[in-house]
A protein has these predicted regions:
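Solvent-exposed soluble domains appended to multi-pass membrane proteins
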Residues: 1-205
Length: 205
């Protein structure tokens, strides 16, 4: 990430310490925690002592740095999740891993066309949506947008009568339209009407 920010490994270790000390999420209490990582932000530069993988010179430097940083952040998240699994309250806990935007941003077009990145780097802007300890085990391969995450989580939490159900559609809804609007107002997917597109773009803004 950018300079002078707490690394994800240190960040999650500090979060774990606060839970262990009872400063946050005490046993027997319900809690909502939102933990925001930063190491995986451009320009994707990690100190040498934190780099656990390396790539040949065939891989563009920016692409290699991105994957090295992704490895670091993934490991930090993984260690924290494994810790959460040891807690008594884990059985009633939903862990959601997502992002506010896709990773490569302005680097994507360049890497898509590079000899080392072509065929590896997608020209699509993907953002992860991973639910750990979900009451429903599934993999969703169709198109969905960030707007669809909130109503999906309401479904998983069985909050179908919640006072605000969001602007998107739950992926558990068999009638969900398989499309999404990107940050550049580009539309991905199919099976939607002009009215659906207009609504999604308005909701994005």
């Amino acid at each position: 990430g950018t300079h002078k920010r707490t690394g994800d490994g240190s960040f999650f270790a500090q979060c774990q310490e606060k839970i262990e000390k009872g400063e946050i999420w005490k046993e027997g209490e319900n809690a909502y925690m939102q933990l925001i990582t930063y190491s995986g932000h451009a320009p994707f530069i990690l100190p040498e002592y934190l780099r656990e993988i390396s790539f040949s010179s065939d891989i563009p430097e920016k692409m290699g740095n991105y994957m090295i940083t992704a490895r670091y952040t993934d490991k930090a998240i993984g260690k924290f999740v494994e810790y959460l699994k040891t807690l008594p309250q884990y059985k009633e806990t939903l862990i959601v891993i997502t992002g506010d935007h896709e990773g490569l941003a302005s680097y994507r077009a360049e890497l898509c066309e590079s000899p080392g990145g072509k065929g590896i780097v997608s020209d699509k802007q993907f953002t992860p949506f991973i639910v750990v300890n979900s009451p429903i085990g599934m993999r969703y391969d169709e198109v969905m947008g960030q707007i669809d995450m909130y109503p999906t989580l309401l479904n998983l939490l069985q909050l179908d009568d919640y006072y605000w159900t969001g602007l998107g559609e739950s992926i558990l809804n068999p009638e969900k339209k398989e499309f999404a609007v990107g940050s550049q107002m580009n539309v991905e997917g199919e099976g939607y009407s002009p009215e659906d597109e207009d609504f999604a773009k308005e909701a994005y803004n």
